[in-house]
A protein has these predicted regions:
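Short glycine/serine-rich donor-binding loops of glycosyltransferases
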Residues: 331-334, 352
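A short, well-ordered alpha-helix in the C-terminal region of glycosyltransferases
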Residues: 2, 372-375, 379, 386-401, ...
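Aromatic "clamp/platform" in nucleotide-sugar-dependent glycosyltransferases that forms part
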Residues: 326
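Conserved acidic donor-binding segment of nucleotide-sugar-dependent glycosyltransferases
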Residues: 358-359, 363-370, 379-385
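Nucleotide-activated donor-binding/catalytic signature segment of Leloir-type glycosyltransferases, i.e.
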Residues: 274, 278, 285-312, 317
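Short hydrophobic beta-strand element within catalytic cores of glycosyltransferases
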Residues: 343-346, 356
Length: 434
């Protein structure tokens, strides 16, 4: 049984890294796993893709991205989030045929890597079951990766708020229609990272009739492990005598979905507390902005942390991690922090609900209530004995649910079911012809 993972990249971003780690975990578990990407950043021989080193490869990548995002230029009121129309041509189907997998596992395939019609091509020469690891909402929307308050994907997209469009027959409508046409009667199993994302998929018009099975994301608990707090703080030149409040993501202050404004309001509440002089805020994922962002507490910016070791050091240095996101498919930073024995304070919403157990391994605040978010931070930090218990429970949660071995075994079981079902169908068809 040969499995092929399709992902836009094998590193350089949370979705890409998650796909690559899953591929490596399956190899470790004895699965004949391969990976095909548009942009290859690792030197792994089990990954096929362009390294972007040669001039022609750079030109192809530039053309792909230009074609992919050209239609968006007409939408002058488009919001800042990613929108992927998936129109750039490619030769992925030819490469898939050369590898000849039994099962194809799709991951994050936007950015001009695949078009909706390509999925049907994978099953033209022989039956191959498709599994789609949902890492955001794009597979069942008209192009946005997170829908916010919009629920148009439950019927059909159009008049897209992400595009700032009032035209029903806009790019989101056309993209959604292309998906519906291409995926009609397609044999595919949907594997969302969280129960919230699974519920969204079940409610969507595109996937409501597909098999949906939640398989959580996973991390390397050997890399993301508790490090002595004093040592971690020394390595990052952080104060030893402060309660450190950590916040971070890709573009944490610019991406509205990450909830920075809620954090800012919560910290303003916290700054009025008598013990606020004990607190300091640490932010990773961005440099210190040119303009003051008024966090009301002393703040250190660590910049972009691009390796697991430095991230683990940052998590271990903190007393609490705050994840004030509005929507998260899973919330990988929360799991990474918990694996380093750092409790998490977040809103009780979307994918974060699968990992944070209120007042057991962190604090689940009322949705988008900055006052309760502030209360949660204070509650975690104000009692040393409680903080120690929360930290232990945080690590235990990850070890019991979110390890590579847990993830690999669930996917192995799913692949085996699908492969055996296909094999029995083929055997039946062959015997019927005899």
């Amino acid at each position: 049984m040969k499995v092929l993972h399709l992902s836009t990249a094998d590193a350089n971003g949370g979705a890409a890294r998650g796909a690559y780690w899953m591929h490596k975990a399956l190899l470790q578990a004895g699965v004949d796993s391969h990976m095909l990407v548009a942009d290859k950043f690792t030197s792994d021989p089990t990954v096929t893709g362009s390294t972007g080193i040669t001039g022609s490869q750079k030109i192809r990548k530039g053309l792909r991205q230009t074609l992919e995002y050209w239609p968006l230029k007409r939408y002058k009121n488009k919001k800042s989030g990613v929108f992927s129309p998936a129109i750039a041509p490619n030769n992925i189907a030819v490469q898939v045929e050369a590898i000849d997998p039994d099962i194809i596992n799709l991951h994050w395939i936007a950015g001009g890597f695949l078009r909706p019609q390509d999925l049907r091509k994978f099953q033209e020469t022989r039956h191959r079951h498709l599994v789609w690891t949902l890492r955001d909402m794009w597979p069942f929307t008209g192009g946005c990766h997170y829908s916010g308050t919009c629920a148009a994907y439950q019927t059909s997209c159009g008049s897209c708020p992400a595009l700032g469009s009032s035209n029903f027959y806009d790019l989101s409508y056309k993209t959604w229609q292309r998906k519906q046409s291409a995926w009609k009667n397609l044999d595919i199993t949907i594997a969302p990272l969280s129960n919230w994302l699974a519920d969204c998929a079940r409610q969507s018009a595109l996937f409501s009739h597909q098999r949906i099975q939640v398989i959580p994301n996973a991390i390397d608990t050997n890399k993301y492990r508790p490090i002595d707090k004093a040592t971690a703080r020394n390595l990052l030149n952080l104060p030893q005598n402060k309660k450190l409040i950590l916040f971070g993501a890709l573009s944490p202050t610019a991406d509205s979905r990450k909830g920075f404004t809620h954090l800012r309001d919560a910290l303003q509440h916290l700054s009025s507390q008598p013990v606020s002089s004990d607190y300091e805020v640490i932010i990773f994922g961005t440099d210190k902005p040119a303009q003051n962002i008024a966090l009301h507490l002393p703040t250190t910016f660590l910049g972009y942390l691009n390796d697991d070791i430095t991230l683990a050091i940052a998590y271990s240095a903190a007393d609490v991690m705050v994840v004030p996101s509005i929507q998260e498919a899973f919330g990988k930073t929360s799991i990474e922090a918990m694996s380093c024995a750092t409790p998490v304070v977040a809103f009780k919403t979307t994918g974060l609900q699968d990992s944070i157990v209120h007042q057991h391994n962190g604090y689940a605040a009322k949705c988008f209530d900055a006052t309760d978010l502030s209360a949660g931070i204070k509650w975690v930090l104000e009692d040393e004995s409680r903080l120690q218990t929360l930290s232990e429970h945080a690590r235990q949660t990850v070890e019991s649910k979110f390890t590579f071995s847990h993830q690999a075994e669930q996917y192995k079981s799913l692949y085996r079911q699908l492969f055996e079902a296909v094999s029995s169908d083929v055997s039946y068809s062959t015997s019927s012809l005899a």
